[in-house]
């Protein structure tokens, strides 16, 4: 992709020709290692002369804290949470990503609209509706889909944060235990990500490899996109 374009109608007043930076997305299920790789990529890119902005879900000034409080209460419906996340994304797009891209930054984002769409669909949202919700999003230059099997995710999650209520799909009552619910929920998310791979041009990276091997793979691929 030479320049930027929106999936549908973008925010008003944005001149795409002014966006000279690069938008790079790391996607994948919970516990796959996205945040670890972004923490490695940021200083690597900076050492190679690139200004870098890192962003991710629930980090907007407008909606980030509200989403975290809503998740603690477990009371909002799936569609309401979907729109809450869309608000967070829209705020970050307008006030973080677009200004950084206009200034020539490399924007590294830990998940993008694909996670938000996948989660919404798994929770019963109509796929066409949720895609229209995010039609204002910029098409990234590249999306790296870190993919691994469920059996590799479980030990990673257990050794980091443990089973989270939302990341285990506990609100959907998919299993008798948090473990069973996590396995079923993440399996459904994997199915959605796999279905998005071709239409959204994901580059699939096997995330079952070591952190160093995945990082080297990303370095090689990103270098080719920045040349």
Go through each PLM region and give its residues.
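Hydrophobic "anchor" residues on beta-strands that sit immediately upstream
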Residues: 23-26, 106, 143
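NTP-dependent small-molecule kinase module
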Residues: 2-17, 42, 158-227
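Conserved nucleotide-binding/hydrolysis micro-motifs of P-loop NTPases
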Residues: 59-61, 113-114, 148-154, 211
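Hydrophobic residues at beta-strand termini and immediately following loops
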Residues: 55, 146, 205
């Amino acid at each position: 992709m030479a320049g930027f374009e929106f999936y549908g109608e973008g925010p008003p007043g944005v001149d795409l020709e002014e966006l000279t930076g690069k938008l790079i997305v790391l996607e994948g299920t919970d516990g796959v290692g996205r945040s670890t790789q972004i923490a490695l990529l940021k200083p690597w890119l900076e050492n190679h002369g690139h200004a870098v902005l890192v962003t991710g879900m629930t980090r907007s000034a407008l909606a980030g804290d509200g989403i975290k409080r809503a998740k603690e209460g477990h009371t909002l419906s799936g569609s309401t949470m979907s729109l809450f996340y869309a608000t967070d994304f829209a705020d970050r797009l307008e006030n973080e990503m677009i200004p950084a891209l206009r200034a020539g930054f490399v924007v590294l984002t830990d998940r993008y609209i694909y996670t938000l769409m996948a989660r919404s669909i798994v929770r019963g949202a109509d796929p066409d509706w949720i895609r229209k919700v995010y039609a204002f999003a910029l098409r990234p230059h590249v999306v790296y889909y870190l993919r691994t099997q469920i059996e590799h995710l479980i030990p990673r999650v257990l050794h980091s944060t443990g089973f989270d209520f939302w990341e285990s799909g506990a609100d959907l009552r998919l299993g008798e235990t948090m473990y069973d619910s996590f396995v079923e929920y993440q399996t459904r998310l994997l199915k959605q990500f796999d279905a998005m791979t071709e239409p959204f041009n994901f580059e699939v990276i096997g995330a079952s490899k070591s952190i160093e091997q995945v990082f080297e793979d990303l370095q090689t691929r990103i270098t080719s996109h920045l040349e």
